[in-house]
Amino acid sequence: MHDGPARQGKHQGIETPNILKINMERLVPDEPMPYDVPHELAEWSVQNTIHKAKHEDTDQMAVIHGSKYKDLRLECAEALEKIGYRLFLVANPEELLKRPRDLLEIIVSLRKAMNPNSALYFSFVELNFIPLLVYLGVDLFSQTGADFYAQLGVITTPHRNYDLKKYPLYDLTFEELKQYNRNSLDFVLREARAHIQNGTLRNLVEERCCSSPETMSALRILDRDYQEFLDSYTPLY
């Protein structure tokens, strides 16, 4: 089922979009690389990632490297798909969320080029970004962000995060806060699935994108520069 570019389906029995709890042992060996590096270093990372993935189990999760370079991200994804992988972690997620223009260029390009049966996974995400990422075609998300913010004493909500020292909304232990944040993530994804079913995800995206400069900027760029991508998923009656 589609609502715009967003997809609702199943991955290995899990209804998507959803949380994917993954053992890091299921991650195919790769060649990590920071985001803002020269093209030559990013290309080296891609080539080594592809080489390491050639003799691994294709049911595992492969990593799409390429740093800030769209051409390298596409090269990496194409090569990994040819090997047989269908589950992909998008590298450098924190950096992409800080750079809306890069985020859109890379994710839209990947979604357009990749096999529809391939699933994209974000290992770190802000909750207010999830409706937009789902709208772009990201399928699976990690609990890493929920647990990370709990360690910092920060409570996460669909609209924004609160440092409990500054905003003492609740008196929670670490375990209680971690569970609260995980529940918030679960709610946001359930909400996204319900909106896809009702054909109203775009409304949710517009509502949540008002909650931060990064999400607002990303939505403006999406509507201005990627209308053809959005229109390709708009049903004609």
Model-derived segments and their meaning:
Residues 13-15, 160-166, 201:
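Short, solvent-exposed loop/turn motifs
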Residues 59-176:
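Glycine-rich phosphate/ribose-binding loops and adjacent secondary-structure elements
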Residues 51-60, 83, 113-116, 191-198:
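A structural motif corresponding to the C-terminal end of an alpha-helix
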Residues 2-6, 18-23, 30, 168-237:
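C-terminal extensions of enzymes
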Residues 41, 45-48, 72, 102, ...:
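Soluble or luminal CAZymes and related metallo-dependent hydrolases
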Residues 46-54, 77-78, 104-111, 182, ...:
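Generic structural signal for well-ordered alpha-helices
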Residues 1-59:
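Non-catalytic, usually N-terminal nucleic-acid engagement modules in DNA/RNA processing proteins
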Residues 36-43, 97, 175, 179:
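Charge-dense, low-complexity intrinsically disordered segments
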